[in-house]
Amino acid sequence: NQKYLYEMTMYYPDEMDEQGNYHYGYFEAYFTDAKRKAFFIYDEETLVGFAMLNPYSYIEHQPDYTMAEFTIFPVYRRKHYAIDAADLILSGNRGKWEIKYNEKNMGAKKLWTRVTKPYAPVVYHINDEETVLEFTNYY
């Protein structure tokens, strides 16, 4: 979690605490709140990434799922783990979705544009840097 939060500081100006750690206020809730889901992405026995879902909208709509966090650790990128994991998560969680990415994060932009293309997402630019893709995947 810390490495992911550190990496996200390239896109978001989060501050470290005195011990050099970043805090993710809802982390524990992904393991205790029934509305939230955490997925650990493995290749065999090797942890290669994680994803976190919740039902809270970025655009004041009422999604069934929002991709709150998603990462493949840097050493495992460009090996199709992200595409495969995203497809599995989407196919296992049918409904109305929102996925947000930072326009500066070209890897995320490319991934989510590709993965959501079959669902013809509606694109919302919520500010100069952030885009939300809204779609349904009932089929």
Question: In which residue ranges do the predicted regions lie?
Answer:
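Conserved beta-strand-loop-alpha-helix junction that forms the acyl-donor binding cleft
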Residues: 98-113, 117, 125-128, 138
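A conserved beta-turn-beta hairpin within the catalytic core of GNAT-like acetyltransferases
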Residues: 56-67, 77
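Conserved acetyl-CoA-binding loop-helix of GNAT-fold acetyltransferases
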Residues: 72, 78-91, 110, 114
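Active-site rim helix/loop that mediates acceptor-substrate recognition in acyltransferases
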Residues: 15-38
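A short, internal acetyl-CoA/4′-phosphopantetheine-binding micro-motif in the GNAT/acyltransferase core
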Residues: 67-78, 101-103
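Short amphipathic alpha-helix that is part of the acyltransferase structural core
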Residues: 1-22
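Short glycine-rich, basic-tinged beta-strand/loop micro-motifs
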Residues: 90-100
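Conserved beta-strand in the GNAT
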Residues: 38-40, 46-55, 66, 71
